[in-house]
Amino acid sequence: MMVNDDFQEYVKQLVTKHRDERIYPFQYEGKKYWLKQPEKLKGIWLLLKPHPKKSFKNELYTLLKLAEQNAPVPKVSYYSDHFFVLENVGLTVSQWLCNKNIDEQQKFLIIYDACLALIDLHAKNLVHGRPAIRDITWDKGKVTFLDFESRSNSRNQNWVVIRDMLFFFDSLCREEDISDTFIQKVALYYQTHCEAKNWQNMIVFLQRFSWVYYLLLPFKPIAKTDLISIYRLFEIFLIKKK
């Protein structure tokens, strides 16, 4: 990794100045970067997240290994044992889709690019772990995945792919500004372009757990975002198709 001395020195100054900030955005020679450091935890968070430095090292290791596999992840511009710098990769898909100044045709273009990127990721036998649209960015046609949680305890590749797909579509269902009709079109596009077995496996999973939908249905009038997204997921993929 070739990094010029001036950039290294500038980053080291930022690390000293912002040592208590986990994530700090900055500009250098007209480009935006993100400085990331281990979380500085206090109180109850020391129990809930007892190994922040280990988590930090795992995140860096994951990014570097995925980059070696040509996965669409942010470029690590500079790193050491206690910080790393990522190049900015644009707005998230969630930000794009909820922007009222962008027409629907452009929004479909963006989400279709995200669909193809996730499908390609699975074709490479890679999984994200939580590919919500807030963890996927789009910039001039380039899709990048953030916050990989690719280490799964499951040895069942079919399951981890299904889980990725469910997280992706559930994140669409969480957004109030995204209509059911929009999601249905996205689902059809995804189904058309992904491996048939992956789509079928996801539908079978939803059918198997459709009882969850009916169990939770009485709570719909008072449901918050988490439950509403589950209702929408089942309704769009199963109920409305009957």
Curated annotation (Swiss-Prot):
Entry-linked InterPro entries: Kinase-like_dom_sf (IPR011009)
Stated name of the protein: Uncharacterized protein HI_1326
